[in-house]
Amino acid sequence: MRNLIVCLVLLTGLVRTAFADEQKPAAKPLDVKSTFRNICGFCHENYGRKAAKGPQLMNSERSDEFMFNRIKNGMPGRMAAFGSAFTDDQIRDIVKFIRNLKPDQEPQNP
């Protein structure tokens, strides 16, 4: 009887653990403007409108796919990879933010 109770307690714990991942709340939307200022802004000044350690990003001729891959995978010796810091959807939002930059307007979150 004691073994049965121990097994039931362990089984209950395993079931609760298995379903715990499914009950996580949705990720909070990324504040792209603040993220860009605090992380990307070190190398891409004025929200990417001015070249610094990194290139100017506003009006870039690079494709969205190129920008996505560069943000996600980086470039050894030139840019850190941020694929482990952001989800793919968040990286897409960063690319949208860059695409919407205007020289004379305050940047907006996508």
Where are these regions (language model features)?
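Residue-level signal for short amphipathic helical patches enriched in basic/charged
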Residues: 35, 74, 85, 89
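Bacterial N-terminal signal peptides
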Residues: 6-13
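C-terminal capping alpha-helices of c-type cytochrome domains
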Residues: 84-110
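Electrostatic cytochrome c docking/interface patches
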Residues: 14-35, 108-109
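Positively charged n-region of N-terminal signal peptides that target proteins for export
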Residues: 1-4
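Cys/His-enriched microdomains
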Residues: 38
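Short, conserved sequence motifs enriched in acidic/basic residues, glycine, and aromatics
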Residues: 26, 61, 85-86
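Gly/Gly-Pro-rich "capping" loops immediately C-terminal to redox-active cysteine motifs
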Residues: 29-33, 42-78
